[in-house]
């Protein structure tokens, strides 16, 4: 819980240099694997897509 609190604080505070700003998943706080188009990490994206919570997204099959 303390880690999540620190993540929330880091969202509010702007860094000294803009290149230090790292996009994080708002659901789990993960800094890596962020999908900018959907605004979440790949893991949360996959879970929501499989549950059908993201409109227009479905599992690929060919």
Swiss-Prot record:
GO terms for molecular function: rRNA binding; structural constituent of ribosome; zinc ion binding. Signal peptide: none annotated. Zn(2+) binds at residues 25, 28, 41, 44. Binds 1 zinc ion per subunit. GO terms for biological process: translation. Pfam families: Ribosomal_S14. Keywords: Metal-binding, Ribonucleoprotein, Ribosomal protein, RNA-binding, rRNA-binding, Zinc. Binds 16S rRNA, required for the assembly of 30S particles and may also be responsible for determining the conformation of the 16S rRNA at the A site. Belongs to the universal ribosomal protein uS14 family. Zinc-binding uS14 subfamily. Part of the 30S ribosomal subunit. Contacts proteins S3 and S10. This is Small ribosomal subunit protein uS14. It comes from Sulfurihydrogenibium sp. (strain YO3AOP1).
């Amino acid at each position: 819980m303390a880690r999540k609190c620190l993540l929330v604080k880091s969202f509010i505070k702007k860094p000294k240099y803009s290149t230090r700003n790292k996009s994080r998943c708002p659901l789990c706080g993960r800094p890596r694997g962020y999908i900018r188009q959907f605004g979440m990490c790949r893991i949360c994206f996959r879970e929501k897509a499989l549950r059908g919570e993201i409109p227009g997204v479905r599992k690929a099959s060919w």
